[in-house]
């Protein structure tokens, strides 16, 4: 239990911040200089994964190590859902966090990784409270609402964060004798359901991901109740990555200051091109 608390505590340290996808050490330095609390090292950002199709896997360990060597902030890396061997490799590299990610191809359609067997904290995606609690029961130390990565479209991100938070709100209104039935409906352990009802929030940090492309997008999900944001394609597919990175960090930290939001949103150049008609929905993977 001590290790679990330590891992959850490490994830709590990222609260209120921005985690940025990077594919080179230079991009990692841009993210760090802009004030990112962590970077996600991968070979392709989600929009390129979406465009190229095929099977997407864990990134080359050499790339991950080069990113780790280039920055002082925490480094995350992605593994396929259920691929515990990829996770073992990342743990051996001493990455700071592992993301069991629906953005990559699914390795096991029946089981997620048993994250309790690892010393590294895990991040997992969810579209609703049941998914979130199941991932936490497997050992996830952070949940991110999935959204639709690589689209630049915030619609699914807002849908998923609203779904999770509204289901938590409903739990807090339930009587104690109703919670076992709620647990069955959610497909989640009763102890986690009770803890969530008592806390009025998840027992781990809840970030938002998928489609965040502007400072206003970040402000929106923070005002809805997110603890922080992941930004993938939105930074390095924009016209001015340095400016967008800095602006989104400021917007996340001071999300309720409309004057600041207006100021940091000025003269940023073109945001990433958006994709709204999806042939592949990453968010449907790994429920």
From Swiss-Prot:
Residues at which D-glyceraldehyde 3-phosphate binds: 162
PROSITE patterns: PDXS_SNZ_1, PDXS_SNZ_2
Gene responsible for this protein: pdxS
Residues that, per the record, bind D-ribose 5-phosphate: 21, 150, 211, 232-233
Gene3D superfamilies from the UniProt entry: Aldolase class I (3.20.20.70)
The keyword Lyase is assigned to this record: yes
Stretches of the chain forming a coiled coil according to its record: none
InterPro entries: Aldolase_TIM, PdxS/SNZ, PdxS/SNZ_N, RibuloseP-bd_barrel
Documented EC number(s): 4.3.3.6
Protein family per UniProt: Belongs to the PdxS/SNZ family.
UniProtKB keywords: Lyase, Pyridoxal phosphate, Schiff base
Keyword Ligase set for record: no
Pathway in which the depicted protein is active: Cofactor biosynthesis; pyridoxal 5'-phosphate biosynthesis
UniProt xrefs under SUPFAM superfamilies: Ribulose-phoshate binding barrel
Active-site residue numbers: 78 (schiff-base intermediate with d-ribose 5-phosphate)
Known catalytic reactions: aldehydo-D-ribose 5-phosphate + D-glyceraldehyde 3-phosphate + L-glutamine = pyridoxal 5'-phosphate + L-glutamate + phosphate + 3 H2O + H(+)
Subunit record text: In the presence of PdxT, forms a dodecamer of heterodimers.
Functional summary from the UniProt entry: Catalyzes the formation of pyridoxal 5'-phosphate from ribose 5-phosphate (RBP), glyceraldehyde 3-phosphate (G3P) and ammonia. The ammonia is provided by the PdxT subunit. Can also use ribulose 5-phosphate and dihydroxyacetone phosphate as substrates, resulting from enzyme-catalyzed isomerization of RBP and G3P, respectively.
Any one GO biological process: pyridoxine biosynthetic process
GO MF terms, alphabetically ordered: pyridoxal 5'-phosphate synthase (glutamine hydrolysing) activity
Cross-referenced NCBIfam families: PRK04180.1 (NF003215), pyridoxal 5'-phosphate synthase lyase subunit PdxS (TIGR00343)
UniProt protein name: Pyridoxal 5'-phosphate synthase subunit PdxS
